[in-house]
């Protein structure tokens, strides 16, 4: 009884498309821009091989901003899917 109720409430799975990839890339760019303006010491910690290529970020700042970008992108993608935009 409970299993059939849960299955009836489940949504259709989201299929990957280039639009999903573009949204994730845009969310990561927004997160990196946000991190660039708000991280107090962006070059702290171990340096990256070509720090100017990564905007002067150290490894911790780069990992933090891209992790935040993926969390933000996942929320945007799932939110748009929930609204029926995908």
UniProtKB/Swiss-Prot annotation:
GO biological process: photosynthesis
Subcellular location: Cellular thylakoid membrane
TM ranges: 14-34, 53-73
Membrane topology value: Multi-pass membrane protein
Keyword Nuclease: no
Propeptide: 1-4
Superkingdom of origin organism: Bacteria
SUPFAM superfamilies: Photosystem I reaction center subunit X, PsaK (SSF81563)
Protein name: Photosystem I reaction center subunit PsaK
């Amino acid at each position: 009884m409970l299993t059939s109720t849960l299955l009836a409430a489940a949504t259709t799975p989201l299929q990957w498309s280039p639009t999903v990839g573009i949204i994730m890339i845009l969310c990561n760019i927004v997160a990196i821009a946000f991190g660039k303006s708000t991280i107090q010491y962006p070059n702290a910690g171990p340096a990256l091989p070509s720090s100017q290529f990564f905007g002067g970020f150290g490894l911790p700042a780069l990992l933090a901003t891209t992790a935040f970008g993926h969390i933000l992108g996942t929320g945007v993608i799932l939110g748009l899917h929930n609204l029926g935009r995908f």
